[in-house]
Amino acid sequence: MKLVLMGLPGAGKGTQAEQIVEKYNIPHISTGDMFRAAMKNNTELGKKAKSFMDNGDLVPDEVTNGIVRERLAEDDAKNGFLLDGFPRTVEQAAELENILSDLGTELDAVINIEVDKDVLMKRLTGRWICRTCGKTYHEIYNPPKVAGKCDLDGGELYQREDDKKETVENRLNVNMKQTKPLLDFYSEKGKLHSINGEQDINDVFVDVEKILASF
């Protein structure tokens, strides 16, 4: 079973990825893990990726695609995999098709976890952290007993810059703009399966299982 998992930040992709790889016994292949492994193993492509990252530059597609090609050719990916964080563009998606074709296979499905932007905003902007002990709270899902104070030590709760409304909204807008052409690409190929990510976590996975039952 060869899958790509998509979803905006806060959609619950990580949770579903864990359940998919456990149930179907396939490797979870994320872009970050691939880069780290290539750099740790000191491969030629790993060295190239490191030089770009050390300079604060984006790793170009030819390097990223090469690292993906090397990873998907490994033995543990022969019977299936879950790709997470790749492809990010239509160009990368087209190259993924070429890579899989060269390996004598193709994608089975692209699963997109859909969550309304307003719901994502609530999920992502609700996090507060204790300045003293670092305990994390959420305004909706795990609120403190007294607003603005830690239950454990009464420490002041603060919000990281990354969790502030303006930052989160900007991140979501950028992601939505990037993702739309990719969703259209896979929809035209008949590979796209969208799931309601606003349900309970277990119900989301039930929907995933229904899709994967046909493969």
From Swiss-Prot:
- Tell me the pathway: Purine metabolism; AMP biosynthesis via salvage pathway; AMP from ADP: step 1/1
Q: Which domain of life is it from?
A: Bacteria
Q: Name one GO molecular function term.
A: zinc ion binding
* UniProt: AMP binding residues: 31, 36, 57-59, 85-88, 92, 160, 171
The UniProt keywords, alphabetically, are: ATP-binding, Cytoplasm, Kinase, Metal-binding, Nucleotide biosynthesis, Nucleotide-binding, Transferase, Zinc
Q: Which residues bind ATP?
A: 10-15, 127, 136-137, 199
Which Gene Ontology cellular-component terms appear in the entry?
A: cytoplasm
Region called NMP, residue ranges: 30-59
The EC number(s) attached to this protein equal 2.7.4.3
Q: Catalytic activity, per the record?
A: AMP + ATP = 2 ADP
Similarity remark: Belongs to the adenylate kinase family.
The cross-references to HAMAP family, in alphabetical order and at most eight, read: Adenylate_kinase_Adk (MF_00235)
Q: What is known of its domains?
A: Consists of three domains, a large central CORE domain and two small peripheral domains, NMPbind and LID, which undergo movements during catalysis. The LID domain closes over the site of phosphoryl transfer upon ATP binding. Assembling and dissambling the active center during each catalytic cycle provides an effective means to prevent ATP hydrolysis. Some bacteria have evolved a zinc-coordinating structure that stabilizes the LID domain.
Protein name listed in UniProt = Adenylate kinase
Q: Which organism is it from?
A: Listeria welshimeri serovar 6b (strain ATCC 35897 / DSM 20650 / CCUG 15529 / CIP 8149 / NCTC 11857 / SLCC 5334 / V8)
Task: Give the classification, highest ranks.
Answer: Bacteria, Bacillati, Bacillota, Bacilli, Bacillales
The primary gene name is adk
